[in-house]
Every structure is written in structure tokens, then in C-alpha cells.
From Swiss-Prot:
Organism ancestry: Bacteria, Pseudomonadati, Aquificota, Aquificia, Aquificales
Gene3D superfamilies, A to Z: Cytochrome c oxidase-like, subunit I domain
Family recorded in the similarity comment: To R.prowazekii RP382.
Protein's name according to its UniProt entry: Uncharacterized protein aq_155
Residue stretches spanning the membrane: 3-23, 42-62, 72-92, 102-122, 145-165, 183-203, 212-232, 244-264, 276-296, 308-328, 333-353
Species in which this protein is naturally found: Aquifex aeolicus (strain VF5)
Record keywords: Cell membrane, Membrane, Transmembrane, Transmembrane helix
Topology term for the membrane: Multi-pass membrane protein
């Protein structure tokens, strides 16, 4: 329960930072905070909820599915690292930098926290690595997919470590941290892809054929990034092309195929958890479509991001309720609990629709009205499921 407890704690603190983000931008209240504190709170929100929180939940799944006891010695660095990350955000230390993959605060406390947290991730990946290698080919589908997350979690800190030693420190701080976290950050996205597919399989609660040749795509690109970090400038055209193809092929093909398979299987015998699966897959397919449509940098990038994140979050929320019931903390899901995943989708939808950018405001308004009407009808039937 160590990692599950860290998941709950980090999500709660990440949510508190989200509240601080809103207050720090509110006229009349923003003056209560130091200048640019908004960015510290934003870093705290993303790093606590979407990095620490999702990783803690994933490692909890490793222990649960691979049936291994937790080890406090390998958990402690991650716990201490999280407190240092959250503390440096809360107290506004250093300079907050809104770079990709690991939003950063330029301060020794933050760097120490990030290092300790990823050390905890690395130590746990070492504990599960023998089982991951064994189950990649011969295990069931869930264990095979989780094995890819173990392998990639082993590679990611090593990629960051190599990047630290061979990334030149120039005058442009933003470019330095972009290069530092580029390949390792993309490996992290492969971890998230493996987590997402695992969520779908767990919510489906039915056997799915193990397509190990697709699972191979989830590890081939991170292995390539590990070696590319040694020889390539991550921000070169070759480095960016490599990571773009990783998204399109390495993540896109396995997630879309498994998403469609679980979607078809889920609609036969819908219940609350399978309805969440349908919602999660639908969101992901929408986000993936926007991702494939992106050319350069436009406002579809945040729309793609929020939609994909929503697909992960609704699955995590549903599984959290499932496990809380199994642990005896909840007897039955009420209407409020059932509405929480749906409300998460609504928030991310409005963030995405505000960012999608290419359509006229009139068209966006009509689309929003139609989707709101459809989702209201779906919610009424959703809340009635046992």
C-alpha cells in the first residue's frame, strides 16, 4: 500500500496546486502571491499529479499484478523526492521554467527531489526487471504490457543520466532543459502508453490476445532513444524526427489497435467500469487523431495533450474506486463517485475545445452545444449503472 498511498497523496497535493494556480490568476487575489508564483504552482501541479501520481499508481500495479511485496528501501527515495519537488513549488524557490516533459524549478532542492524520485523509480524497475523480461513474450497480455513499462522505466533514468553529462550548458536555459529532458521525456510517454493500455485491460476484465509484436514497438523506440542520447543532439532535426516517428508508430499503432480491440469487447456487456473504458478509448482516439493532424506548433497541441491525459485520468479514477471497494474503504459507488470521471472529461473537453483553434467561434459554440446535450443524456444512463 506504500505506492498506492503515495498516489493518493500526490494526486491530492497536485489538486491543491491546481487550486493555487487558479487563485494566483484571480484578480484581487493574485496580489497575495509573489510575482510569477503562478508558474511555481503550475510546476507543482503537473509534477505532483501527472509525474509522481501516475508513476506511483503504475508501480502499485506492478506489485499487484506481478505479486511482489513492497520494499520500503526502494520506496523511500521516491517519497523524499516527492516532498522536495512539492516543497520547492509551494515555497516558490528558484525560477520556475515551463519546459516540456518535466516542468522545472531551477533550484538545488528541486533537482535533488527529481533525482531522488527517479532513483526510486529506477530501483523498483530493477526489482521487477527479471519478471518483465520473462513475461514480455510468455505472459498474458496485461503482464506483457506492464513489462514494457518496467523496461522503459529502467531505461528512462539512465537516459536522463547520460543527458546530464553530455548536454552542453549554453546561455539559453530553456533550450538546455528541453535538450536535457527530450529523449528521456519521450521514453516517459511510452511508459504512459503502457499504463493506458493496462488500464483498458483491467477495466475490460476479459482476456485479450497478447500481440507481443505490437508490444515490441513500445520498447524498441525507448531503446533507440537511450543510444541516440549518446550520439545525437536531441533537438537536432534527426533527434526530433526520431521522436516524432516514435509517437506516430511506436505509441500510435499499439495504443490504437489495443484501444479498438478493447472497445469492441467492452460494448458487449456494458457496466460502469466498461463504460469508463469506452469513454477512455474514445477520448484517446480523438486525441490521437488530433496528434496525427498536428503540423509544427499550433493550438491543436494542447487540445491533443488534454484529451490524451483525460483518457488516462478517467481510467485511473475508475480503477482507484475499484480497488478502494476491494480494500473495504467503499461499499458501493454512489452517483457522486460515478460522476467524478465524467466531470474530469468535461473539464478537459472545454480546455481542449478552447485550444483547438482552427474552427470559428460560431462552429465551436454549435459543436459544444451538441456534445453537451449528448453527454448529458449519456450521464443519466451512466449514473444508473451498478
Amino acid at each position: 500500500m506504500l505506492w498506492f498511498s503515495l498516489f493518493i497523496l500526490s494526486i491530492a497535493i497536485g489538486g491543491s496546486f491546481a487550486l493555487l494556480v487558479a487563485i494566483a490568476r484571480t484578480p484581487g487575489l493574485a496580489d497575495l502571491f509573489p510575482p510569477k508564483y503562478f508558474y511555481h504552482a503550475l510546476v507543482g501541479h503537473v509534477d505532483s499529479a501527472l509525474i509522481v501520481g501516475l508513476y506511483a499508481f503504475l508501480i502499485f500495479l506492478w506489485h499487484r499484478i506481478f505479486e511482489k511485496k513492497e520494499n520500503f528501501a526502494s520506496f523511500l527515495p521516491a517519497l523524499l523526492g516527492f516532498f522536495m519537488i512539492a516543497g520547492s513549488s509551494l515555497f516558490g524557490l528558484g525560477q520556475a521554467l515551463w519546459n516540456n516533459y518535466v516542468p522545472t524549478i531551477i533550484h538545488p532542492v528541486f533537482f535533488g527531489g527529481v533525482s531522488l524520485f527517479f532513483l526510486g523509480v529506477f530501483l523498483n524497475s530493477l526489482r521487477f526487471l527479471p519478471q518483465a523480461v520473462k513475461n514480455f513474450y510468455i505472459g498474458d497480455t496485461l503482464k506483457s504490457i506492464l513489462s514494457t513499462t518496467v523496461i522503459n522505466s529502467f531505461l528512462m533514468p539512465l537516459t536522463y543520466l547520460i543527458a546530464y553529462f553530455n548536454t552542453p550548458k549554453g546561455e539559453n536555459v530553456y533550450e538546455y532543459f528541453e535538450a536535457l529532458f527530450w529523449f528521456g521525456g519521450h521514453t516517459h510517454q511510452f511508459v504512459n502508453a503502457g499504463l493506458l493500455i493496462s488500464l483498458w485491460l483491467l477495466l475490460l476484465r476479459r482476456e485479450v490476445l497478447n500481440l507481443w509484436f505490437l508490444n515490441l514497438l513500445l520498447v524498441v523506440f525507448p531503446i533507440t532513444y537511450f543510444f541516440a542520447q549518446i550520439f545525437l543532439n536531441p533537438l537536432s532535426s534527426t533527434g526530433k524526427s526520431l521522436t516524432t516517428w516514435g509517437y506516430m508508430v511506436g505509441i500510435g499503432i499499439p495504443t490504437i489497435v489495443y484501444g479498438l480491440i478493447t472497445l469492441v469487447r467492452a460494448v458487449k456487456g456494458l457496466d460502469f467500469y466498461r463504460s469508463i473504458l469506452v469513454l477512455s478509448v474514445s477520448l484517446y482516439l480523438l486525441g490521437a487523431l488530433m496528434g496525427y493532424m498536428i503540423v509544427g506548433m499550433d493550438t491543436r497541441v494542447p487540445a491533443h495533450y488534454h484529451t490524451v491525459i483525460a483518457s488516462i485520468l478517467v481510467g485511473v479514477i475508475a480503477l482507484t474506486f475499484m480497488y478502494l471497494q476491494e480494500l473495504g474503504y467503499m461499499e458501493k459507488l454512489g452517483k457522486f463517485e460515478k460522476f467524478i470521471p465524467f466531470s474530469t472529461v468535461l473539464v478537459c473537453f472545454f480546455l481542449s475545445s478552447d485550444s483547438s483553434g482552427r474552427e470559428s467561434l460560431e462552429l465551436q459554440g454549435k459543436l459544444r452545444e451538441r456534445i453537451t446535450y449528448k453527454t448529458q443524456r449519456f450521464t443519466y444512463s451512466w449514473l444508473s449503472w451498478d
